[in-house]
Amino acid sequence: MELLKVAILFAVTAVAEIVGCYLPWLVVKQGKSAWLLLPAAVSLSLFAWLLTLHPTAAGRTYAAYGGMYIAVALVWLHVVDGVALTRWDFVGAAIALAGMSVIALQPATDT
């Protein structure tokens, strides 16, 4: 699977996980309707299913996915929570994405 496809799949997976966790947070922390727990459950189920579509062993998938999760979480922080990102956020995301790329693009025959 090429890097663009892997990156898109990781990004969609991260959004599903973040939505699935953010909605219950709204219920608990901001007193929003408990009905938000239903789409949260759907989103977390989608997240779990999306993880099965990744092209490698589960542990390696989770390790590589972590880099994309960091980047998507920072975008969420800015867009949804309205928090300005710092240069350190950008540097950290770049390092995490570089790590994701190393793990995701390693040769299949490397031991």
UniProtKB/Swiss-Prot annotation:
- Which SUPFAM superfamilies does the record match to this protein? Multidrug resistance efflux transporter EmrE (SSF103481)
Q: Out of the domains of life, which is the source?
A: Bacteria
Membrane topology per record = Multi-pass membrane protein
Where found, per UniProt?
Cell inner membrane
What keywords appear on the UniProt entry? Cell inner membrane, Cell membrane, Membrane, Transmembrane, Transmembrane helix
Q: Which InterPro entries match?
A: UPF0060 (IPR003844)
- GO cellular component entries: plasma membrane
Q: Which residues cross the membrane?
A: 8-28, 33-53, 65-85, 88-108
Name the protein family: Belongs to the UPF0060 family.
Q: State the name under which the record lists this protein.
A: UPF0060 membrane protein Ajs_1473
